[in-house]
Amino acid sequence: MARNATTSSAATAPSEGDPNISRPMNVTASSSEPAINPTLTDTPTATFLRQSTAMQDATLYPGGSRSLSGIAVHAFGLGLALASSILLTILLLHLSNPLWRLPSFIAILSVFHFLEFYATARYNLPSAKLSSFLLFSNGRAYNIAHTCAMLEIVLVCTFFPSWLAVVSAPWSRALGLGLVLMGQGIRSLAMAQAGTNFNHIPAKQHKEGHELVTRGVYGWLRHPSYFGFFWWAIGTQLLVGNAVCGVAYVLVLWKFFSDRIRGEEEHLVQFFGEQYVNFRERTGVAIPFIR
């Protein structure tokens, strides 16, 4: 009789349950603390949580050097500037208004600054930052030069339109457009082929993984990005008919690249030794009077 009572009591008592049913835990006899079952943690949710924790990079937040919201705003602004400039250029050309030069110059600048960031983000992701757009990080002289170019366009077109017949012939505009396209293409190609070896700021110390690129466009030009920018900039001034800024661009850019190449190559010889010396001997710069 007692046996039956015991059996009945056990049957009616609430079940403690198996902890392995309600949660992915294993309880061992030697420990009262549940242990995480390693076979149950490799789930999409667990993987997402681990990745989310790893992505807590302060530079990606607003105000950071790689701020995603900042990148979005910059890209949107450049796209808006490009679209509106193209439409305004077409309208002013249709009206035979010489001021078409101003929006066309802005359109070219918009493409340049977008491609600077895009090429960096696409082929050199670790170096991609807000500053890669080069909108506000390319030096005060750069911004002053383009501001002066815009002012010359407005002043000449408004007060001295007859001067354009002298300095802006159809052939010079065609040559300018050709130089812009060639220069932009070679610069972007150079950034793509250099990959992570490209940097907007010349390296002064040899970092691990930095290689000397000698393939592709680097097989003919040892500084193709400088070549591209030099002729791109001159092309913009030929296209818009800026005589004063055109001459100033040539002089300032030649001086800038002459000094920069000389200083940069001193470090490159230190980094790569005889390999760079031989590379320098068989390639050129293609900027007048810079060897």
Feature annotation, model-predicted:
Residues 2-208, 235-291:
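Membrane-anchoring alpha-helices and their flanking helix-loop junctions
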